[in-house]
């Protein structure tokens, strides 16, 4: 198939304006500046998941804190009871370190100093 010179020029004359029209739309300028705050849907979802996990472990954290506080209160009360037992006017009172109680030497019963 032979393409004559006139057909080539006609085809070129048709394609050149089309190519220029397409290239001008591709290179369109804009005066708008887009600034992203970093607050994307993915970061919001990640934050929501972290908050949910924090809330789920809240009950466990509270239990641990209560247990620690309870053990500290128990040790503090035992320390105070030991001091009272040792300073008691009752000569038969003695402090039992294994049970953390003040006992009577004669009977072995718990006494209140």
From Swiss-Prot:
Keywords: Signal. The keyword Signal applies. The keyword Signal applies. Residues 1-28 form the signal peptide. Belongs to the UPF0482 family. This is UPF0482 protein YnfB. It holds the Pfam family DUF1283. The gene is ynfB.
